[in-house]
C-alpha cells in the first residue's frame, strides 16, 4: 500500500471506477494528527466485517480509492473531515460507512466519527456533463438557438443510454434501478432496455429470448412485474411463456405491429398507462377462446360443450379408455389409455379434445398442446408444473 502527504491530505491508491464517496466528520478529545486518524480507520475496522469488506484487502483490489483526511486542532480538541471513495455497491458502501462510526479512539484520545452523506459520484458527473454540454452547444454551434430545456433532454437521453448494466447470473441487460424498485418492467431484448433508459425508465430488464431466465422468475416473486412486449406474434409467444413460469401482475403491449425498441416517449408512456391486470387478460382471452369454440360447434345447438364432454366422460369412465374428438366433439379414435401417448405421437390427427379414463400428466399436456388440442379431460391432475394458455384442462369432477 502506498501513501503520501500532499497539502495536509493523506492519499492512497486512486481508483477511477469510483461509484460513491463517503463524507464523514471526526471530532477528538485531544490533539491528534493525520497518521493517527488513518491508523484508527484501518486498525479499528480490521476483522470487523470479515475478509470481503476488510479495508486493506479492498484497497489492494482497488475497490476503495484514495482516502482523504483533513484535520486541525483548536483549544485542545481536534476536528476534521474524512472522504472514502468506493466502487462497492450501495449496500456494501453503506456497511463500510457504518463501520467508520464504530471508531471510538484516535491515537490516545477519545473520538467520534459521524457519516454526513454518501455522494453518488456518477450522478454528480452526469450533472456536470449536462451543464458543460449545454455550454458547448451554445458557444460552438452556429445553428438556430435551441431551447435550454431541449438541450438538457437531448444530453440526458444520451447519458441514460449508457446506464445499461448486466443483471443476475445470466447477465441480463437491465437499467440501474432494478434492486431499488418495488416494481419492474420486463421487456424482450437489449434494444428495448436501451429505448426505455433513453426516456428515463430505469427499472427495466430484458428476458433475451423465449426461454425465461431464472433471474426473471425469482424477481417476479418479490416485485410487481409489468410485461411490456412488442405488438406482434413474437410478443405473444414471450408473453405466453412468461405467464407459465413467472408471476406477472400487468401486461402492456406496444401498438399493433410496432416494437418496443422503436417507440417514442409518448407511445411508451401511453402503452404503460394502458397496462392490463393479468387477471383481466385471462378473462379477455377466455372470452375470445369461447367465442371461437362456439363457432366451431355451431352444428350442436342443443348441447353445451360441457354436456357433450360429460357424455364422453361417462362412456370412458371405468373402462381405461381414451377418446380423441374432432372440432365438433365427435369421436375420431377410441383407444386404450396405455396407447394414448403413442397414438398422439404417431398420428397427425387434428382434434379438439381428449377425454380419457386416466391421470392427466405434464407429458400428456405438453403433447396435447403441441398437437393444438383445445381440451383435455381426465380423472385427476398428476404432477403438473405448467399448463399452456391455449389448452383447457378439466377433471371428471369439474364436469
Swiss-Prot record:
InterPro entries: DnaG_primase, Primase_DnaG_arc, TOPRIM_DnaG/twinkle, TOPRIM_dom. Binds two Mg(2+) per subunit. Mg(2+) 1 binds at residues 188, 230. Transmembrane segments: none annotated. RNA polymerase that catalyzes the synthesis of short RNA molecules used as primers for DNA polymerase during DNA replication. Also part of the exosome, which is a complex involved in RNA degradation. Acts as a poly(A)-binding protein that enhances the interaction between heteromeric, adenine-rich transcripts and the exosome. It catalyses: ssDNA + n NTP = ssDNA/pppN(pN)n-1 hybrid + (n-1) diphosphate. One of its GO terms (cellular component) is cytoplasm. Mg(2+) 2 binds at residues 230, 232. Pfam families: Toprim_4. It comes from Archaeoglobus fulgidus (strain ATCC 49558 / DSM 4304 / JCM 9628 / NBRC 100126 / VC-16). Belongs to the archaeal DnaG primase family. PROSITE patterns: TOPRIM. This is DNA primase DnaG. Keywords: DNA replication, DNA-directed RNA polymerase, Exosome, Magnesium, Metal-binding, Nucleotidyltransferase, Primosome, Transcription, Transferase. Forms a ternary complex with MCM helicase and DNA. Component of the archaeal exosome complex. GO terms for biological process: DNA replication, synthesis of primer. NCBIfam families: PRK04031.1-1 (NF003108). Its cofactor is Mg(2+). Its EC number is 2.7.7.101. The gene is dnaG. Residues 182-268 form the Toprim domain. One of its GO terms (molecular function) is poly(A) binding. It is an enzyme of class 2 (transferase).
Amino acid at each position: 500500500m502506498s501513501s503520501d502527504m500532499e497539502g495536509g491530505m493523506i492519499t492512497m491508491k486512486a481508483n477511477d471506477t469510483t461509484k460513491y464517496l463517503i463524507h464523514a466528520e471526526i471530532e477528538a478529545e485531544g490533539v491528534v494528527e493525520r497518521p493517527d486518524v488513518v491508523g484508527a480507520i484501518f486498525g479499528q475496522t480490521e476483522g470487523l466485517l470479515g475478509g470481503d469488506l476488510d479495508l486493506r484487502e479492498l484497497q489492494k483490489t482497488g475497490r476503495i480509492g484514495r482516502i482523504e483526511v483533513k484535520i486541525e486542532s483548536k483549544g485542545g480538541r481536534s476536528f476534521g473531515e474524512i472522504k472514502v471513495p468506493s466502487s462497492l455497491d450501495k449496500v456494501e458502501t453503506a456497511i463500510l460507512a457504518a463501520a467508520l462510526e464504530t471508531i471510538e479512539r484516535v491515537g490516545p484520545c477519545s473520538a467520534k466519527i459521524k457519516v454526513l452523506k454518501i455522494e453518488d459520484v456518477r450522478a454528480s458527473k452526469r450533472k456536470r456533463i449536462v451543464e458543460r454540454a449545454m455550454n458547448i452547444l451554445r458557444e460552438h454551434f452556429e445553428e438556430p438557438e435551441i431551447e435550454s430545456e431541449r438541450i438538457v433532454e437531448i444530453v440526458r437521453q444520451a447519458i441514460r443510454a449508457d446506464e445499461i448494466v448486466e443483471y443476475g447470473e445470466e447477465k441480463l441487460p437491465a437499467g440501474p434501478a432494478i434492486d431499488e424498485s418495488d416494481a419492474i418492467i420486463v421487456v424482450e431484448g437489449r434494444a428495448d432496455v436501451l429505448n426505455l433508459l433513453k426516456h428515463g425508465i430505469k427499472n427495466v430488464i430484458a428476458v433475451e429470448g423465449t426461454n425465461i431466465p431464472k433471474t426473471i422468475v425469482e424477481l417476479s416473486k418479490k416485485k410487481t412485474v409489468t410485461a411490456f412486449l412488442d405488438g406482434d406474434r413474437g410478443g405473444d409467444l414471450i408473453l405466453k411463456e412468461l405467464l407459465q413460469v413467472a408471476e406477472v401482475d400487468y401486461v402492456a403491449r406496444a401498438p399493433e405491429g410496432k416494437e418496443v425498441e422503436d417507440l417514442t416517449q409518448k407511445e411508451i408512456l401511453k402503452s404503460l398507462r394502458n397496462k392490463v391486470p393479468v387477471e383481466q387478460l385471462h378473462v379477455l382471452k377466455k372470452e375470445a377462446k369461447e367465442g371461437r369454440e362456439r363457432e366451431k360447434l355451431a352444428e350442436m345447438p342443443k348441447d353445451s360443450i360441457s354436456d357433450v364432454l360429460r357424455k364422453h366422460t361417462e362412456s370412458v369412465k371405468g373402462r381405461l379408455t381414451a377418446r380423441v374428438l374432432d372440432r365438433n366433439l365427435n369421436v375420431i379414435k377410441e383407444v386404450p389409455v396405455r396407447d394414448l401417448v403413442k397414438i398422439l405421437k404417431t398420428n397427425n390427427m387434428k382434434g379438439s379434445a381428449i377425454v380419457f379414463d386416466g391421470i392427466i400428466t405434464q407429458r400428456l399436456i405438453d403433447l396435447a398442446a403441441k398437437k393444438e388440442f383445445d381440451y383435455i379431460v381426465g380423472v385427476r391432475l398428476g404432477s403438473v408444473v405448467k399448463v399452456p394458455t391455449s389448452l383447457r384442462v378439466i377433471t371428471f369432477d369439474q364436469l
